[in-house]
């Protein structure tokens, strides 16, 4: 998926978290509806296509389905097709799915996740299984499923004439195409998160050149691996460094809703995920809600990048905690 970058200075953020000011929100008592059952169904439907490895029929079919679902909920949708150099320096075709749901704000909030599956199960104990693709129920489909349910809920509010923020949805492709463990050739840099790199550069170009495709964004929220029964979401380093105010807002909302057991106060090492390129290349402050397990050697769940990343590891309570926190956060004025 990506690599954890260990910076010694990350420890300084431990002091910053305890010093954050608590501010009262005008919507302090509001909870916004979210259906974990619906999100779970969206995840299962993605998994039913098979592994969504770029360039495969399963990938293409799932992408078409995602476009139809977003259109069904009233969003404007298009596929951003392009290519990026992969780990071997070859051009890798990609398809980002970009949608816009107009609300009551001029600047939209970015909701994003990756929708592709990793072609290799690098962390499989058995060597012969390492060349099979990861099904990606949690690593990929879970974030997309939560976003689809949030869009569905927002469309209901909009149909009633109620306030919603304008939202841009970007489902990144080729996030999990990073250098495989078995590769022995010369490795190129920035081999993970190809779709977000492509989108971020295009976004910056559209903004700088005043193109009609430019969509002004307030901030972004990335969802990655948000279905694990034992998930904990720390304040990831890059999120806090580039978008600390929005981290504080989301974690404070989670605490108010009773989800502090998931959204913990721990500060995680820097994680190179899609949000890194949204922050550094696009210049949009973006936070990463990602399950992090420092007690494990990989930093992630035991079944990360294995054949066991399937629906058995998707939990309704975790989906509810994440989905309700995110929709309540973005709808708070």
Features from the language model and the residues they span:
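Second-shell loop/turn segments in exported
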Residues: 27-33, 48-57, 84-87, 129-141, ...
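Extracytoplasmic/secreted proteins, especially bacterial periplasmic and envelope-associated proteins
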Residues: 38-45, 61, 65-72, 142-149, ...
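Active-site-adjacent substrate-binding region
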Residues: 81-83, 91, 219, 226-333
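C-terminal motif of bacterial Sec signal peptides marking the signal peptidase cleavage site
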Residues: 16-18
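A non-catalytic alpha/beta surface segment that caps or lines the substrate-entry region
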Residues: 44, 51-104
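N-terminal capping segment at the start of a domain
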Residues: 20-62, 73, 297-313
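Acidic/histidine-rich catalytic neighborhood of metal-dependent amide-processing enzymes
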Residues: 131-245
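Solvent-exposed loop/turn segments at secondary-structure junctions
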Residues: 53-54, 83-87, 104-105, 115-119, ...
